Curated annotation (Swiss-Prot):
A motif ('HIGH' region) lies at residues 112-122. It is found in: Cytoplasm. GO terms for biological process: arginyl-tRNA aminoacylation. One of its GO terms (cellular component) is cytoplasm. This is Arginine--tRNA ligase. Belongs to the class-I aminoacyl-tRNA synthetase family. The keyword Protein biosynthesis applies. HAMAP family: Arg_tRNA_synth. GO terms for molecular function: arginine-tRNA ligase activity; ATP binding. NCBIfam families: argS. The gene is argS.
Amino acid sequence: MKKRVQSELSKLSDKSIILEKPRDRQFGHYATPIAFSLAKELRRSPMQIADELAKSFESSSIFEKVEPIKGYVNFKLSESFLDEYATWALKNESEFGKDEQGETILLEFVSANPTGPLHIGHARGAVLGEALSRLGKHLGNEIVKEYYINDAGNQIYLLGLSIYLAAKEELGQEVQWPQEYYRGDYIKDLAKEAIEEFGKEAFSDESLIDKLSEWGKEKMMELIVSNLAAVDIKFDHFVSEKALYEKWDEVFAILKEHDAVYEKDSKVWLKSSEYGDEKDRVVVREDGRPTYLAGDIIYHYDKFKRGFDRYINIWGADHHGYIARVKAAIKFLGFDPDKLEVLLAQMVSLLKGGEPYKMSKRAGNFILMSEVVEEIGADALKFMFLSKKADTHLEFDVDMLKKEDASNPVYYINYAHARINSVLEKAGKSAGEVIDTPLKDLNEDAKDLLFEALILPEIIEDAFAKRELQRLTDYLKALAAQFHSFYNKHKVIGSEYEDRYLKLFLVVALSIRVGLRLLGIEAKKRM
């Protein structure tokens, strides 16, 4: 709708016009500050320019009113334009809010170590990545979702060792546990399965540990993929860190060629401080083994060689320090580091009845994503994880998400959608019977509700551009509240406005349905 207004204005002016939303609806639906930017060029006051622009824009049928106010030009959209757009949206649900942005984007998220089940920290990044992908595709971008498997480090050996020792314990043997190992019932379960798989006798030989490491990694990846599928998240690619190390010689040669590394104290250092890092970083240890950072450098070399327009990584907040060093490496490799965006997902704290949520016995010292999904459902989990900016700490009480009242936003929004279906049923009308009803002579409450329902495409575009999904969750909460308020205030069935209000409600339901779908949530028809 905003683009349609801008398109109309471009016919009447050769200037690029930026539209803003006035804080107070009495000043119209949109406003432009263009008179201020033209004032210096034309050597005239913004008020004079705004007066003239307002007169030239009045001729458009899409405006009910064009008014200059303190140098701004304010626009109030006509009922006929809003009705025309509403009718189109209802008849073209699959196209509503779509665009043709056309970027190719490689989106990497989750990338949890394959050494245990997914916990709620992983879940936040998973939900954010999936929602970003859905919004981006809706806006006409080609998005590839990728999971980076960290399978080259010592943690994979520790997984195999933990399974090995747990199996020996299961077989009644005395075990000396090391300081570092993986614990939790999932390790015991893997140990029992490993005994079945490899036989009791195999656990007398420590050479089995390497096999168990690879076997355990595969089992954990199966579990992770299953956990993600339970919340409707599927990846296009899985990339193994271990497999990528084959490219280290190639990458290291480029770094040396570009004078990006040097030797000191029997180690090889990356000159990352030259490009924004606080100090140089080790990429090769004294024993010749590449560091964790080297793995990241290889992976980003592999990414950028694939030629996407943009690369988005979703990392845990504890990886903040890695951004500058990875971007420095990208620069040294001859690529544009500005093409990489890193979104940081902060910690999640769960409560239950006001008390800290109990840690999972199965995982040891984590709260499992699967257990929370089982308790509150995937939809509630997704909505709450998207309800705040990713880089802010999130705390919520799972008991609140079980309530059937306005304090539970997921329920409240779904109730609005289900309520609209119920109203149509009570009225004995189908969508097809009211879809072409002209939305005219509406009161101000109805006009405001209609406009709010129709600005969903702008919210989608804004949420994706700023990578802030809470803009969409906030919008859906506000739209549902506005609908409930309207319905409680105005008579619908049996009134002279019945068909007009039913059509208005269909537009509200459409925006709720499309908005929730982009968050990975299916709107409920009945509750």
